[in-house]
């Protein structure tokens, strides 16, 4: 009823009743056969949950702005490359989109909170990202080192940061050492990547048939004559079985003595399958050590990520190394020192030929063109030789962050924070 009265029928004596209501703690009561008078307690734990806002923390019950939080359990359970990918779909109003770099292994996702609204060319709608209180790139942080992520969505929540927080704030707090026995934690995963939207490429017979029809309608001639069509049919049926014969490779020598690629070739190549790998393996390893006592706590963590790209030819790989150290020392009853050091290195290799024209040309290559010629060389006019032998672009990026903080408490609950930080970044190609 309206006063919380309820009646249950056919309940055996000695049964345990579970009573719950929104905003109250769940209670279990054993029924002895007599009427029960049950009083539920307020669920203060939900309201006491601490979220990071501005320069400090608040209980949820006191937060009036729009704030969302994700804890470490969510981030650690997702085998992804970086923090931005781990946050996808986890926070309402946090939108991710692919930028101009596309799906390159070192590319960053575009992030906006509750949509983007900008004024004038060159303006940006990106949120302010703070890692342990200082601005940084979230993709340089190992997701396993994160304790929680708070997203401040509205003006009331982010106003303390001023104009730079006009599009919201993302606050990332990394884990601290925990007093007690030394604990060693290791986690690793092996994952596989695949391209999920590869276009379907027509086979050589259908391609040659349609091409001849178009050529005949336009010019009254054909590109693939009857001999070519017969060779295509034989090749697709596996009729060429002698690797010492040029027909085995889907080509013959032309009148100029060169192996033919376009007109005159009769292989059956799916160029999307040729350039893109399937089920590419990647691996990640995380190791952390933490412990301490009432006076001092420490944490040391490291990680290694080896992410392979989807390109079959040439070097396409991304590697990230991270090292994070934290120590907290109680120098006196009224002063505590916190020191934090982070180091991240990213190495990325990709073929020099990786331009927009490369992806454009994959779809333009005829399926009749062979991958290799009868001499075992990569076929001319195809991108494979540029990918394999045209060199590679190598980049190395390093981030080093040092933070130190002194927390003074001259009287109970009056905290004075004195902080300093130094960030270093360098890259070479």
What are these regions (language model features)?
Residues 1-324, 336-337, 401:
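Short, small/polar-rich motifs associated with maturation and membrane association
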Residues 87, 92, 364-368, 412:
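Proline-centered flexible-loop/turn and helix-kink motifs
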Residues 277-296, 303, 386-429:
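Outer-membrane beta-barrel transmembrane strands
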């Amino acid at each position: 009823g309206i006063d919380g009265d309820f009646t249950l029928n056919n309940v055996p004596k000695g049964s345990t009743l579970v009573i719950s209501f929104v905003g109250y703690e769940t209670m279990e009561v054993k029924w002895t056969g007599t009427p029960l008078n049950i009083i539920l307690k307020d669920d203060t734990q939900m309201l006491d949950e601490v979220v990071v806002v501005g320069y400090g923390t608040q209980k949820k019950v006191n937060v009036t702005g729009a704030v969302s939080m994700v804890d470490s359990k969510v981030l650690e359970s997702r085998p992804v490359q970086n923090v931005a990918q781990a946050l996808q779909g986890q926070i309402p109003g946090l939108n991710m989109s692919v930028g101009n770099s596309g799906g390159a292994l070192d590319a960053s996702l575009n992030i906006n909170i509750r949509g983007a609204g900008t004024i004038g060319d060159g303006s940006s709608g990106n949120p302010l990202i703070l890692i342990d209180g200082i601005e940084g790139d979230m993709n340089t942080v190992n997701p396993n080192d994160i304790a929680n992520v708070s997203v401040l969505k509205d003006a009331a929540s982010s106003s303390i940061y001023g104009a730079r927080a006009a599009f919201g704030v993302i606050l990332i707090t990394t884990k601290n050492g925990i007093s007690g026995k030394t604990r060693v934690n290791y986690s690793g995963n092996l994952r596989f990547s695949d391209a999920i939207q590869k276009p379907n490429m027509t086979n050589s017979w259908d391609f040659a048939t349609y091409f001849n029809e178009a050529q005949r309608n336009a010019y009254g001639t054909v590109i693939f004559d009857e001999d070519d069509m017969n060779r295509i049919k034989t090749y697709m049926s596996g009729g060429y079985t002698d690797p010492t014969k040029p027909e085995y490779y889907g080509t013959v020598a032309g009148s100029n003595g060169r192996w033919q690629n376009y007109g005159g070739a009769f292989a059956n190549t799916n160029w999307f399958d040729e350039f893109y790998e399937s089920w590419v393996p990647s691996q990640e390893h995380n190791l952390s050590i933490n412990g301490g006592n009432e006076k001092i706590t420490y944490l040391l963590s490291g990680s290694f990520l080896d992410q392979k790209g989807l390109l079959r030819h040439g070097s396409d790989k991304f590697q990230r190394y991270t090292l994070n150290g934290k120590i907290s020392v109680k120098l006196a009853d009224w002063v505590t020192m916190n020191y934090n050091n982070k180091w991240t290195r990213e190495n990325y290799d990709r073929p020099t030929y990786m331009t927009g024209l490369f992806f454009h040309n994959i779809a333009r290559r005829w399926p009749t063109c062979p991958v290799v010629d009868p001499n075992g060389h990569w076929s001319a006019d195809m991108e494979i030789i540029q990918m394999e032998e045209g060199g590679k672009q190598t980049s190395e990026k390093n981030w080093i962050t040092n933070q130190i903080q002194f927390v003074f408490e001259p009287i109970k609950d009056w905290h004075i924070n004195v902080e300093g930080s130094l960030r270093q970044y360098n890259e070479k190609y």
